[in-house]
Amino acid sequence: RLRRQRQICIRDRCRLVQIKIAESRSIFFKDMQNSVIPIMVSHGEGRVGVNVNENVIGNYVDSSHNIAEKYPLNPNGSKNGIAGVCNEDGRITIMMPHPERTFMTKQFSWAPNDWDEHSPWFKMFDNAYKFSKN
């Protein structure tokens, strides 16, 4: 059962963290599993409270790609570093971070040289577009 809880830190936070995309049914993350991508978080409340690790779409991770349990790498203190979940058929996905703030490479202060105009988060939006065309 999914529930929203107050985050551990009670201040608004806006910063980059890393997420490792999990294998899931989410249509948004097709062919993205195991990618580790920086992403913006920006919120003052909310952390994911999930009793089981089913349908997890991604986890906050540290620089060694281990699940981050504590602030600041897990900015809201979600259990098991859960950043989001999807429903059983993958058509509904909810997540705390903001991929819309990081889908263009120019939205980052620094990016790897192998990124083109779009960051890896653009694939999430492209997947949604392709799903809607079917």
Regions found by a protein language model. Give the residues of each.
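Amide-donor transfer/coupling interface in amidating biosynthetic enzymes
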Residues: 11-134
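Single conserved hydrophobic/aromatic residue that forms the stacking wall/gate
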Residues: 1-10
